[in-house]
Amino acid sequence: MRVKRWLLAGIALCLLTGMRDPFKPPEDLCRISELSQWRYQGMVGRGERIIGVIKDGQKKWRRVQQNDVLENGWTILQLTPDVLTLGTGTNCEPPQWLWQRQGDTNEAMDSRTTVDADTRRTGGKAAKSDADGG
């Protein structure tokens, strides 16, 4: 009789606590794993109105302001030209996340010479020109 009670109590405890798949990672309610995919690109604004520009994990551009709450529950705590501080939630670890501004640089475009540009425009030959137009 005692074994049946313990077995019944064990089964009831399992049902009440909910079984989870041990091979599945725990659910990320705070979406902390997404933080590394987002980028703070910079800010624009004049006076008191400051708008931050961020890129999310799906490469979608978003405009945010201080104290905005994003759809995943994160809150924009501080917005400066170089840093965006984000609150992830009270029960989340870490409770705050800091992004430093990151701009995209295109090294190939920045290092291209004018001869390369002339070559594309003239159909493959770099045109020589001088002051008299010849």
Curated annotation (Swiss-Prot):
Disulfide bonds: none annotated. Transmembrane segments: none annotated. Disruption phenotype: Mutants are unable to use DNA as a sole carbon and energy source and show decreased competitive fitness when cocultured with wild-type cells. Residues 109-134 have a biased composition (Basic and acidic residues). GO terms for biological process: carbon utilization; DNA catabolic process. InterPro entries: HofP. Residues 95-134 are annotated as: Disordered. Required for the use of extracellular DNA as a nutrient. This is DNA utilization protein HofP. It comes from Escherichia coli (strain K12). The gene is hofP.
